């Protein structure tokens, strides 16, 4: 039985804001790819219905933590629909590698890993599609992590189409600041009218992120980081930031640049993968 479950990072290889709904949600087109790097969750089934997070995050109550919320959401769904009467409790701990507020999808990935893992461990029998639909209540990015394949997303991020971008190597760097998503989406200067284009057109265009100009304007550290990385390779913001990634054809090239990074830059090198490590471990392609 698997105890340790990967919770991978994601990159937005491009991100375009195409409009805004009356309820305030932004419409977008984005290309998600996973990284072979992320957090690790250790999950053990309890013989009661208690959900215990053994590694709480300072300043974040359990009822707001996406790990706990995901476990309780699945628990309530299974109870409501009478799915398996086996004990459905869990003890969960996390080895955290991904920065908060970095644009790497850490919280959404954690929630998705909990849904996928506990669905297996509790023998709930839900399909990935059902789990993805359930996970949407936790965040717009959760479904792509649940489904586990690189994807082109539209709408508010919930309409997913499988995609297979090149699996390049990336230097992912954090400027030392966290950027709350509302800071970017609430900025009056954010471009919200990028034309909607079909995927085949977007894949042939130069990739960009409509959130990047706002992040660079409002956070001097992001501006400095992007400017430094652009000296070495094509680089851009992921999500709403604050992490920036530079793309390379080889791991060696990426590590050479990381080794030259100033002390204020914290980063790692990882490979882009189109099948999530979470799903590869479930299918036995990689060892737990």
Swiss-Prot record:
EC number(s) on file: 2.7.1.148
Keyword annotations from UniProtKB, A to Z: ATP-binding, Isoprene biosynthesis, Kinase, Nucleotide-binding, Transferase
Which pathway does the database say it acts in? Isoprenoid biosynthesis; isopentenyl diphosphate biosynthesis via DXP pathway; isopentenyl diphosphate from 1-deoxy-D-xylulose 5-phosphate: step 3/6
Which residue positions are annotated as catalytic? 10, 141
Q: Which residues bind ATP?
A: 99-109
- Which class of enzymes does this protein belong to? transferase
GO terms for MF: 4-(cytidine 5'-diphospho)-2-C-methyl-D-erythritol kinase activity; ATP binding
Pfam families named among the record's database cross-references:
GHMP_kinases_C, GHMP_kinases_N
A single GO BP term for this record reads: terpenoid biosynthetic process
Task: Return the SUPFAM superfamilies for the record.
Answer: GHMP Kinase, C-terminal domain, Ribosomal protein S5 domain 2-like
Its recorded reaction(s) are: 4-CDP-2-C-methyl-D-erythritol + ATP = 4-CDP-2-C-methyl-D-erythritol 2-phosphate + ADP + H(+)
Q: Would the keyword Transferase be found if you checked this record's keyword annotation? A: yes
**Complex and partners:** Homodimer.
Task: Quote the function comment for this protein.
Answer: Catalyzes the phosphorylation of the position 2 hydroxy group of 4-diphosphocytidyl-2C-methyl-D-erythritol.
Family statement: Belongs to the GHMP kinase family. IspE subfamily.
Name recorded for this polypeptide: 4-diphosphocytidyl-2-C-methyl-D-erythritol kinase
Species annotation: Serratia proteamaculans (strain 568)
Q: Give the gene name.
A: ispE
């Amino acid at each position: 039985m698997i105890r340790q479950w990967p919770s991978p990072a994601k990159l937005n290889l491009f991100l375009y804001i195409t409009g805004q709904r009356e309820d305030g949600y932004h419409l977008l087109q984005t290309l998600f790819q996973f990284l072979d790097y992320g957090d690790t969750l250790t999950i053990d089934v309890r013989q009661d219905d208690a959900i215990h997070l053994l590694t709480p995050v300072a300043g974040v109550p359990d009822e707001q933590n996406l790990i706990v919320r995901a476990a309780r959401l699945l628990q309530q769904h299974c109870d409501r629909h009478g799915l398996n009467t086996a004990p459905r409790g869990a003890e969960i701990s996390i080895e955290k590698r991904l920065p908060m507020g970095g644009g790497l999808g850490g919280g959404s990935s954690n929630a998705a890993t909990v849904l996928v893992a506990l669905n297996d461990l509790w023998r709930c029998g839900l399909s990935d599609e059902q789990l993805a639909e359930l996970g949407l209540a936790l965040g717009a990015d959760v479904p792509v992590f649940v489904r586990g394949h690189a994807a082109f997303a539209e709408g508010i991020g919930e309409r997913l189409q499988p995609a297979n971008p090149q699996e390049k190597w990336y230097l992912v760097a954090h400027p030392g600041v966290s950027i709350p998503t509302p800071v970017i989406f609430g900025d009056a200067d954010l471009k919200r009218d990028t034309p909607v284009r079909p995927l085949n057109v977007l894949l042939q265009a130069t990739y960009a992120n409509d959130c990047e100009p706002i992040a660079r304007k409002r956070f001097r550290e992001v501006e400095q980081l992007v400017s430094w990385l652009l000296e070495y390779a094509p680089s851009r913001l992921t999500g709403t930031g604050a992490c920036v990634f530079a793309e390379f054809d080889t791991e060696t090239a990426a590590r050479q640049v990381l080794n030259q990074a100033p002390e204020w830059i914290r980063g790692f090198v990882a490979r882009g993968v189109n099948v999530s490590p979470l799903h590869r471990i479930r299918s036995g392609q990689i060892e737990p």
